[in-house]
Amino acid sequence: MMGLRLKILSWWTPTWVISRELDHVFQVTTAALKSLLAAHALEIQTKRSDEKSKPKTIEQKRASMAAEHAMLVEALATSIGPEEALRLGREALFRVGKQLGMANRGKLGVGSNPMDLIRAATILYRVLGIEFNIERSDKKRATLIVHRCALSQHYSEVTCRVLSATDEGVVKGLNPHVNMAFTEVLTSGCSKCRAQIEFEN
């Protein structure tokens, strides 16, 4: 039954599921960044929106989340320097991503085979407005190529590299025997994002 859920949602994901999962990703990623800022005695004043001004559509929610990410990462970089912000931000967001991956592995019934990982990634990237494909090199290596990212227009390169650690953590959470690391990102001027994937067995 769980494997069937994974297959169905990878083919078609209802809007309400995308909206719910997007809200959750928004919550946990911004909470991690705010916690980092608080640890460095920084308090960021965020705008409190009333019900009328809250983002309602999927596109609005993605844009709002990305703008919040950018503001928080830039504030951290201004305070402690971009290199330290990158290091600490990636560590924190990798942990968040791994937890998200583990939770979705259970909910979706993700097995150990590569196809299950690709199906789960399809669902999660659909939530974020990211279009991608996978190119296999051999049994142990593959490349993830992102053609479109709804978040990239709101991100600086530093923000993008911090938040990409979430994706890397998600993959590790979905399958503990798989590692992913981004080598190219759209925000650095590349035409596509690329991440190297390695299968341990």
What is each stretch, according to the model?
Residues 1-140, 150-162, 166, 177-192, ...:
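N-terminal accessory segment detector
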Residues 174:
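Surface-exposed, gly/pro-biased binding rims or lids
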Residues 168-170:
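Mixed-charge, glycine-accented linear interaction segment located at domain edges/termini
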Residues 195:
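An acidic-aromatic pocket/loop used at catalytic or ligand-binding sites
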